[in-house]
Structure formats: C-alpha cells, structure tokens
C-alpha cells in the first residue's frame, strides 16, 4: 500500500495549527515502503524555527492519522524544522525576514556572472529590493545599500551570524 503527497497534505491540514505551517513535503515511494519527510515553519519565530516539541506533536498526530486510515502502510516518517539557514521562498520571504541577514546569489546588471553576498533587506517596492550589505560586528560603519531586481535573485538562504 502507498500514500500520496496529496493525502499527506490533506491530513496535515487537519493536524497543523498556526503559527506552525507546512514548509515542504516529500513522499518518496519505494516498492513496499514510503519515506515521508515533513518540514515545518513557525510564522511567529524570527527565523521560522519550530521547536522539537512541536515536531514531536505533529509527528505523533500524523502517525495516528496514517495508522487510522492506512493501517497496513509501511513507512518512515521524518518531521523537522526548516532550519536556521533555510532556503528562502522568493519573493515572499524577503518581506517576512526583513532586517535579518540573508545570503543571496544573484546576477548583477553590470555582468552576467553570478555573485553572492550577505545582506539585510531594507525595503521592497514591487520588483525592486533595497539591500544593505551585512557587516559582521561593525555597528558604526556607514551602511552601503544596493538595489536589485527580483528577477536577478537566483536563490537565497537565511544567514546565521555566530
């Protein structure tokens, strides 16, 4: 017996409650076994981190529902947080994580070469995003701002400054 990602997603709709929501879901089907990977997001945490307790609660509830609707299903269930250096869902996460350091890979208008940098989002106006170069530990330095088109951003992740 197998289970689809749509079925799991439907179950999670009934299991999850705000501020915790689904970040991603993967269901890998094998001939006699399913690997179900659920990644969670916390909308109220500055970095979107989900606690171990929240992961356990979702795992327990999802397991109960799976066993109720599909008792013969052979599966492995992994429930986790999206993580501190999660991949950003662009462009929405640029607004959500404004002011928090992010690592961006982008194409500049001057060259087609990929560039990478660590920035803080200052403002977003339509397809334009104003960024401030992140400088670790330097508080009194004049902040250099740059503007990018959203279409030039190839990928982004949160950046944890340790």
UniProtKB/Swiss-Prot annotation:
Q: Does the keyword Cytoplasm apply?
A: yes
User: Main localization of the protein?
Assistant: cytoplasm
Subcellular localization(s) per the UniProt record: Cytoplasm
User: Got a GO cellular component term for this one?
Assistant: cytosol
Record key words, sorted: Cytoplasm, Ribosome biogenesis
Concerning InterPro entries, the annotation shows: Ribosome_maturation_RimP, RimP_N, RimP_N_sf
Q: Source organism's superkingdom?
A: Bacteria
One family name in Pfam for this protein: RimP_N
Bilayer-crossing residues are: none
Q: Which GO terms describe its biological process?
A: ribosomal small subunit assembly; translation
Q: Does the entry annotate any disulfide bonds, and if so which pairs?
A: none
Q: What does this protein do?
A: Required for maturation of 30S ribosomal subunits.
Write out the similarity annotation. Belongs to the RimP family.
Quote the NCBIfam families the UniProt record gives: PRK14635.1
What is this protein's name?
A: Ribosome maturation factor RimP
């Amino acid at each position: 017996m197998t289970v689809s990602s749509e079925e799991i997603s439907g179950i999670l709709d009934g299991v999850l409650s705000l501020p915790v929501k689904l970040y991603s879901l993967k269901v890998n089907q094998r001939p006699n076994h399913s690997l179900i990977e659920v990644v969670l997001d916390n909308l109220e945490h500055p970095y979107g981190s989900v606690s171990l307790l929240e992961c356990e609660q979702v795992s327990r509830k999802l397991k109960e529902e799976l066993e109720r609707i599909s008792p013969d299903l052979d599966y492995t269930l992994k429930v986790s947080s999206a993580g501190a250096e999660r991949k950003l869902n662009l462009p929405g996460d640029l607004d959500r994580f404004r002011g928090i350091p992010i690592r961006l890979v982008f194409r500049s208008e001057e060259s087609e070469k990929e560039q990478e940098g660590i920035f803080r989002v200052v403002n977003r106006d339509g397809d334009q995003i104003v960024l401030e170069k992140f400088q670790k530990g330097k508080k009194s330095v004049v902040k250099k701002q740059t503007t990018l088109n959203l279409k030039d951003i190839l990928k982004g992740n949160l950046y944890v400054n340790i």
